[in-house]
């Protein structure tokens, strides 16, 4: 079956693995998924990114982070905002603050994929891909 929204697929795989306390999860590799994974790593939601396979069958292996004695997931929720049927764009001043700054939004800008904080610092807006907290 064809996957019409690879970003939603990636977020769902990460969310499901996190809820089940899996150490790693695999997502199909693409430029967008690599960029999103890099932002999640920079913001401290995942610990390591590696690639597996080659060509069309390349997958990213994401090592998830947990905290505390009971291994609480660092990622509590991931929500897709802009969808293929309804794109959501925001300028610099309208970029959302997720949970009053405790979470983050991942933004696709003309300067690449970045967190909402980085987009504000650089003074760029763009497509709001998802919220993570």
Swiss-Prot record:
<dbReference type="InterPro" id="IPR047863">
    <property type="entry name" value="Ribosomal_uS8_CS"/>
</dbReference>
<comment type="function">
    <text>One of the primary rRNA binding proteins, it binds directly to 16S rRNA central domain where it helps coordinate assembly of the platform of the 30S subunit.</text>
</comment>
<dbReference type="InterPro" id="IPR035987">
    <property type="entry name" value="Ribosomal_uS8_sf"/>
</dbReference>
<dbReference type="GO" id="GO:0005840">
    <property type="term" value="C:ribosome"/>
</dbReference>
<dbReference type="GO" id="GO:0003735">
    <property type="term" value="F:structural constituent of ribosome"/>
</dbReference>
<dbReference type="GO" id="GO:0019843">
    <property type="term" value="F:rRNA binding"/>
</dbReference>
<keyword id="KW-0699">rRNA-binding</keyword>
<keyword id="KW-0694">RNA-binding</keyword>
<keyword id="KW-0689">Ribosomal protein</keyword>
<dbReference type="Pfam" id="PF00410">
    <property type="entry name" value="Ribosomal_S8"/>
</dbReference>
<protein>
    <recommendedName>
        <fullName>Small ribosomal subunit protein uS8</fullName>
    </recommendedName>
</protein>
<dbReference type="GO" id="GO:1990904">
    <property type="term" value="C:ribonucleoprotein complex"/>
</dbReference>
<keyword id="KW-0687">Ribonucleoprotein</keyword>
<comment type="subunit">
    <text>Part of the 30S ribosomal subunit. Contacts proteins S5 and S12.</text>
</comment>
<comment type="similarity">
    <text>Belongs to the universal ribosomal protein uS8 family.</text>
</comment>
<dbReference type="InterPro" id="IPR000630">
    <property type="entry name" value="Ribosomal_uS8"/>
</dbReference>
<dbReference type="GO" id="GO:0006412">
    <property type="term" value="P:translation"/>
</dbReference>
């Amino acid at each position: 079956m064809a996957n019409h929204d690879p970003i939603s697929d990636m977020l769902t795989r990460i969310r499901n693995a996190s809820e089940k306390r899996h150490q790693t999860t695999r997502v199909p590799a693409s430029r967008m998924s690599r960029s999103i994974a890099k932002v999640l790593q920079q913001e401290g939601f995942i610990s390591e990114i590696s690639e597996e396979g080659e060509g069309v069958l390349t997958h990213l292996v994401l090592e998830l982070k947990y905290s505390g004695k009971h291994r609480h997931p660092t990622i509590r929720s991931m929500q897709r905002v802009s969808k293929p049927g309804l794109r959501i764009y925001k300028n610099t001043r309208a970029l959302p603050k997720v949970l009053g700054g405790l979470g983050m939004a991942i933004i696709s800008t003309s300067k690449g994929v970045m967190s909402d904080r980085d987009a504000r610092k650089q003074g760029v807006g763009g497509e709001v891909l998802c919220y993570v907290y």
